[in-house]
């Protein structure tokens, strides 16, 4: 996998590689393929006034939710957020992708692979189990690496061995591969910080002095 420089050319209410209208034009034709049947504005359901959209995807696989929300500073940004959330969830399902069944012990030393024990498993988890694996890319070392499918897909079908709960942690989309990876990494960093706050009961200093006009206006709401 080759990653290239990806400049942010749109910097109004968000930072993206292309303008919002171009993103919307790209994704709307893909709505049916992702199983999305309805995209509706639900801003009026509360009194805040920040644009919010709901995306309905009734064909989600067993174990996944079927309703997703998108938010943004503008109606257009919020609509894109909702649709992309639905596309992300569709993309996170296994569908017809092939997986490799093997134990980590059989792979270790022969091919680069993520050790399941590095994924914060429950203390009583035993090793030596046959697990489903898929190929990922180690962006730090620029080479392919096998990853437990449970850390990639959500949900993972029940016929595969479950060593931990699947989730959407680190799931992100973008106008380019680089943009999607950037936002996925940001989400993982955010969740890590969130976990530390919950564990330490320390939220840190309050954020004050917001001088961006759009953020200040949203804060007032």
PLM regions: where:
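Helix-coil modules at protein/domain termini and other flexible surface or pore-lining loops
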Residues: 1-221
